[in-house]
């Protein structure tokens, strides 16, 4: 059943708006005073995802074709829904900033599964001062001597921050395990310690959301070929990607083992069906919004005052400045 949102009459709308504004100011004051308690209370009172966020009705007729199979999401519909969800992401970040909420998002999956594209759509509308993306490379010789989680911990969010890991500590259970970059003993140690590590994060007040982007071998092959044909995207295809392509079954087994040991109630895995990139992005963003108990605290629009005159200021001569050449007159 589709949810219906009642729209008040004009007179009632004015009163409701004033009351809502007063209520939000009170919530903002409470959030700043006690961020942890506010986040906990908001989480317990939050509406269910289906009540707070639901796709537009226009999607109903475009999900399947005449044969009953899912079709690729139409670009115009996708862009319209993405714009709506990105506005909600801005509201979410504003609440996170002022409530002191901390959240870590992990994006895992096979090569070319669409992790980076989804991260890009999440971060596009957000203030970069409160949102960071971490994509760590191969550990240095010094890092190899440290506690395995150490190089990830140093990037963890402070109060009011959103942190997105484009691949994470689960490299040990995946690529390092399959490619032989670590010992079987190190893999087993990771399987045992990772759940406790994540429980510790949750107990400390950090929300941990783990997304696995699932892509079929046929779709991955098509995306690899697309990257080879596009000079601007060819850098995305590395020798390691080609090696993992030949080890599909080994990676599948490693992923199953990883899920078996780390799919804990405090930080479960959420699988994103990613053969359709557009649908995967929308589904992931929708799910993220449903998991953060935010309320709309965004301030009212600001009215710009008249611009002040220049007074006695005189611009310096243009011939004394260096300009970027105008290549597109």
Predicted regions and their residues:
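Charged, amphipathic alpha-helical linker segments immediately N-terminal to NTP-binding catalytic cores
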Residues: 2-9, 13-84
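Conserved nucleotide-sensing/catalytic segment adjacent to the nucleotide-binding pocket
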Residues: 74, 129-191
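Pre-Walker A adenine-sensing motif
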Residues: 87-97
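Phosphate-binding beta-loop-alpha motif at adenosine-nucleotide cofactor sites
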Residues: 104-108, 206-219, 239-243, 264-280
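Glycine-rich phosphate-binding P-loop
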Residues: 105-123
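Post-Walker A helix-loop "phosphate-sensing" segment adjacent to the P-loop in P-loop NTPases
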Residues: 124-133, 296
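NTP-dependent small-molecule kinase module
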Residues: 253-256, 260-329
């Amino acid at each position: 059943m589709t949810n219906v949102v009642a729209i008040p009459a004009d007179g009632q709308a004015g009163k409701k708006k004033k009351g809502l504004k007063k209520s939000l100011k009170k919530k903002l004051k409470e959030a700043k005073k006690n961020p942890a308690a506010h986040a906990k209370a908001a989480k317990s009172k939050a509406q269910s995802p289906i009540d707070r966020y639901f796709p537009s009705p226009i999607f109903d007729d475009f999900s399947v074709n005449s044969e009953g199979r899912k079709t690729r999401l139409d670009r115009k519909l996708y862009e319209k829904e993405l714009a709506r969800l990105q506005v909600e992401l801005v509201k979410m970040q504003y609440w996170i900033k002022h409530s002191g909420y901390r959240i870590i998002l992990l994006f895992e999956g096979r090569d070319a599964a669409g992790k980076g594209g989804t991260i890009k759509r999440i971060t596009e509308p957000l203030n970069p001062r409160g949102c960071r993306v971490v994509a760590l490379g191969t550990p240095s010789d010094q890092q190899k001597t440290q506690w395995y989680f150490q190089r990830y911990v140093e990037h963890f969010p402070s109060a009011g921050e959103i942190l997105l890991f484009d691949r994470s500590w689960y490299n040990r259970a995946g690529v390092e395990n399959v490619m032989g970059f670590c010992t079987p003993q190190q893999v087993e140690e990771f399987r045992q310690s990772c759940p406790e590590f994540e429980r510790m994060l949750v107990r400390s007040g950090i929300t941990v959301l783990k997304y696995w982007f699932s892509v079929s071998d046929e779709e991955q092959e098509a995306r690899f070929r697309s990257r080879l044909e596009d000079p601007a995207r060819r850098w995305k295809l590395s020798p390691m990607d080609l090696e993992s392509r030949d080890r599909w079954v080994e990676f599948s087994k490693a992923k199953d083992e990883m899920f078996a040991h780390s799919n804990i109630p405090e930080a479960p895995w959420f699988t994103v069906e990613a053969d359709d990139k557009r649908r995967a992005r929308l589904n992931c963003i929708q799910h993220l919004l449903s998991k953060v108990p935010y309320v709309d605290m965004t301030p009212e629009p600001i009215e710009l005052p008249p611009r002040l005159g220049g007074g006695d200021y005189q611009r310096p001569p243009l011939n004394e400045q260096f300009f970027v050449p105008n290549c597109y007159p």
